[in-house]
Amino acid sequence: MYAVIATGGKQYRVEKDEVLRLEKLPGQVGDTVSFDQILLFSDGESVSVGTPVLGNVTVSGKIVEQDRAKKILVFKTKRRKRYRRKQGHRQSFTAVRIETIQAG
């Protein structure tokens, strides 16, 4: 059994007990989150595709971590002009363990 959800501008294929690293969601570690944009659902026998979303399927999970990813460096330069700019960035993310996928 799996579903395709949309959150944070991206789409994820999720299964029960899977841990996902999503774009930052509000909430503390241990809070329950539910996803309302379910694009596709499969129970192993049949596949339901939303137009664009399914209304009778719910996916919920529990926040297991709120953290920031590793730092990436952005370095800009212009040749022969001594122009150099170095900038770092760390993206915030939320790790969510999928607990239930229910159709009904």
UniProtKB/Swiss-Prot annotation:
- Entry keyword annotation includes Translocase: no
Q: Name one GO molecular function term.
A: structural constituent of ribosome
Indicate yes or no for the key word Mitochondrion. Answer: no
Q: Which family does it belong to?
A: Belongs to the bacterial ribosomal protein bL21 family.
Q: What does this protein do?
A: This protein binds to 23S rRNA in the presence of protein L20.
Q: How does it assemble?
A: Part of the 50S ribosomal subunit. Contacts protein L20.
**Name of protein:** Large ribosomal subunit protein bL21
Q: Which organism is it from?
A: Desulfosudis oleivorans (strain DSM 6200 / JCM 39069 / Hxd3)
The gene designation is rplU
